Amino acid sequence: MSKPHLIIAAGGTGGHMFPAQALSEAMLRKGWRVTLSTDARGARYVGGFSHAVEIREVSSATFTRGGALAKLAVPFRIFGGVLTATARMLREKPDVVVGFGGYPTIPAMAAARLTGRPRMLHEQNGVLGRVNRVFAKHVAHVACGTWPTDVPLGADAIHTGNPVRAAIVERGGAPYTPPGDWPMSLLVFGGSQGARILSDVVPAAIALLPEAIRDLLRIAQQAREEDVDRVQAAYDDLSMRVEVDTFLHDMPRRLSEAQLVICRSGASSVADINVVGRPAIYVPLAIAVRDEQTANARGPVDAGAAVLMPESQLTPETLAQTIEQILTQPDAATQMSIAALSVAVPDATERLVALVETLAAPTPQET
């Protein structure tokens, strides 16, 4: 008897690919055959996928890149990808197709609809991406990593959470050491490529803190390569113990040891912080077209687990005030930690697996 076959469509950014990777690993353990459908850009992120996953590069494109001629070619490239994917699906008849967003998912999701294969989406952010919004009403379920998520009327939204790495799950609910008269860890990061505004504002905010607090802080801050030296110099002027680098290794350990986290509110970052259970100050990316990072932070902020600080309000003075407020109120900080755990979904991968298995029916869904 042949193995059940899952096609995962994802690409564009690590935000789409990492949860797709988590699902692929879980389905392989369940004995499924797994195929990843992505484009050349998404293929840069496949290094973490198991060698047992078949990688298929499809023809796709985005209207957000390139000049006028490149944009004119986009529909033709996508159409070619859809034709190829449709022909393959007619031959293979996959049991389930799951899209994780991004333009590279268009060929597989369109082909799944045309051939009537069971299909669903996973949306990482609190606002549907462009491609997921197109397909949301034409799939069985929209699995939502962030809750609530803004979905079109008629779409079946289900809260599954965002899958997190096994190393994060292992640190889930690690005992929180509240701030006090002992060394305190402050973790600062800005996503996959850092955030210049955090490099500008955080060191200046730390300089405004009372010396008694500064003397207790141990700071690890991610920064862009071009910002590392100046950020380090700013802390050196304060004679502080800091680690500034373009990439912070062993994030699960760093999260579990932190008294406070300051970061962007990307979907995966929020999920990781909630699962470990740490107080956070979120600075959403202001240029995000759909303001999805503000939506991502809504759950923990409403629960009392985090403080939302839009870029328009982020100054050394406002940030210093917020940091001091959290680090001088240990009981309140502990409650923030507990609140983060209350909105965490450590079993997000298992929830996705359950949906896939439910969809794996012998008859195709209606189109």
UniProtKB/Swiss-Prot annotation:
It is an enzyme of class 2 (transferase). One of its GO terms (cellular component) is plasma membrane. SUPFAM superfamilies: UDP-Glycosyltransferase/glycogen phosphorylase. InterPro entries: GlcNAc_MurG, Glyco_trans_28_C, GlycoTrans_28_N. GO terms for biological process: carbohydrate metabolic process; cell division; cell wall organization; lipid glycosylation; peptidoglycan biosynthetic process; regulation of cell shape. Pathway: Cell wall biogenesis; peptidoglycan biosynthesis. UDP-N-acetyl-alpha-D-glucosamine binds at residues 13-15, 125, 165, 192, 293. Keywords: Cell cycle, Cell division, Cell inner membrane, Cell membrane, Cell shape, Cell wall biogenesis/degradation, Glycosyltransferase, Membrane, Peptidoglycan synthesis, Transferase. It catalyses: di-trans,octa-cis-undecaprenyl diphospho-N-acetyl-alpha-D-muramoyl-L-alanyl-D-glutamyl-meso-2,6-diaminopimeloyl-D-alanyl-D-alanine + UDP-N-acetyl-alpha-D-glucosamine = di-trans,octa-cis-undecaprenyl diphospho-[N-acetyl-alpha-D-glucosaminyl-(1->4)]-N-acetyl-alpha-D-muramoyl-L-alanyl-D-glutamyl-meso-2,6-diaminopimeloyl-D-alanyl-D-alanine + UDP + H(+). It is a peripheral membrane protein. This is UDP-N-acetylglucosamine--N-acetylmuramyl-(pentapeptide) pyrophosphoryl-undecaprenol N-acetylglucosamine transferase. It comes from Jannaschia sp. (strain CCS1). The lineage of its organism: Bacteria, Pseudomonadati, Pseudomonadota, Alphaproteobacteria, Rhodobacterales. The gene is murG.
